[in-house]
Regions:
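Bacterial Sec-dependent N-terminal signal peptides
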Residues: 1-24
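Alpha-helical transmembrane segments and their juxtamembrane interfaces
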Residues: 13-15, 68, 111, 245
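Outer membrane beta-barrel
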Residues: 23-35, 39-161, 172-174, 181-190, ...
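Outer-membrane beta-barrel pore domains
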Residues: 31-38, 74-75, 86-90, 98-101, ...
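Surface loops at the rim/top face of extracytoplasmic beta-rich domains
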Residues: 163-178, 201
């Protein structure tokens, strides 16, 4: 009888948590890599991604993404980083008001893939994401998706600019992102975007400190088609930096990815990245390219093996060649 009473009490206490938490989902993603080059070989832990979604009511929802990764400056050698924290309010139909920290919707890759490597078509992001692409933005905006027969979508977002952090803007200027896309077929998406920001003198972005004020504009275009057999993804971004006392300098970053499913679970692929810098606003940044040849083995939709050969060429530096293997999972 005592055990029965204790069990009943536990159910009564736990009941409210089950009721209120029934629309919350917690998922995880992780990857482990192995790399080999002429300088040596290493095993490495990738990012462990904690992915939370929750429907608070019929209009309000939440998305949170926190990663845990190696950090040389941490006493435990690991650090947590909040990559996305989004509160979504459904205004009408497929139109939403969003607030928080998002992946800046400048192109298909940044808008479609989160930090779970299991969904990446290749092991790493293209080179452009290490340079001029603003990966994250913290602010407020509106978005729409799957509108009409062409599945039209749009994003308008105002945020703290480059050089800011997640709790404080470093100047009075705000960045603005406008993007739109449509889907002429079920597997194809074509889109374009415009990003504008004023970077203050002394700000640091993409690992570079700006010694002059820069008005940055980014124009991006993308086309993606992931069919049953053929996978194609091509994106390009033209950057225009209006630099105090210098004038306008340009940067062009692009990549092309192609994969072909030769068997149900086997997809060989190639990717070519290219970045061309022009002008003093980019400091020590050098023109670079990257060739990737690989194969992806899809164990299932939550477990993937990838093997790649990478050749990276940077102006004024020796070529870097390596072989990388990765296992990525979701759970």
């Amino acid at each position: 009888m005592i055990k029965l009473r204790n069990y009943a009490l536990m159910c009564m206490l736990a009941g409210p948590f089950f009721v209120h938490g029934q629309n919350t989902q917690i998922k995880g993603f992780a990857n482990v890599d192995y790399s080999y080059s002429k300088t040596g070989s290493s095993f490495s832990l990738g990012e462990q991604d904690l992915f939370i979604t929750s429907s608070i009511n019929d209009r309000i929802s939440f998305l949170g993404e926190t990663i845990f990764k190696y950090s040389a400056t941490s006493s435990t050698l690991f650090a947590a980083s909040v990559e996305r924290m989004i509160v979504n309010y459904n205004v009408y139909g497929n139109h939403n008001l969003i607030a928080g920290r998002i992946h800046t919707p400048v192109n298909y890759w940044n808008d479609s893939y989160h930090h779970g490597r299991v969904f990446f078509p290749t092991i790493d992001r293209p080179l452009m994401f290490d340079s001029i692409i603003p990966l994250h933005s913290t602010g407020v905006g509106i978005q729409g998706k799957d509108l009409g027969s062409l599945k039209f979508g749009y994003n308008l977002f105002v945020a703290n600019g480059l050089g800011s952090n997640e709790v404080l803007d470093n100047d009075k200027y705000k960045s603005f992102t406008a993007s739109a896309y449509f889907k002429p077929t079920r597997n194809m998406r074509i889109g374009a975007s415009w990003y504008n920001d004023l970077i203050s003198k002394g700000a640091t972005a993409h690992g570079m400190k700006f010694d002059r004020r820069v008005r940055r504009n980014l124009a991006s275009f993308s086309i993606a088609n992931f069919g049953k057999k053929l996978e194609l993804l091509a994106e390009a971004t033209a950057g225009f930096d209006d630099v105090d006392s210098i004038g306008t300098k340009t940067t062009v970053a692009s990549y092309v990815y192609a994969g072909y499913r030769i068997k149900d679970k086997v997809i060989p692929y190639v990717r070519y990245d290219d970045i061309q810098y022009h002008g003093e606003s980019h400091g020590t940044m050098k023109n670079s390219s990257k060739m990737v040849v690989g194969v992806r083995y899809q164990i299932n939709y939550l477990a993937v093996l990838k093997l790649e050969y990478q050749d990276v060429r940077t102006e004024g530096s020796a070529d870097v060649n390596k072989i990388i293997a990765q296992i990525a999972v979701g759970f």
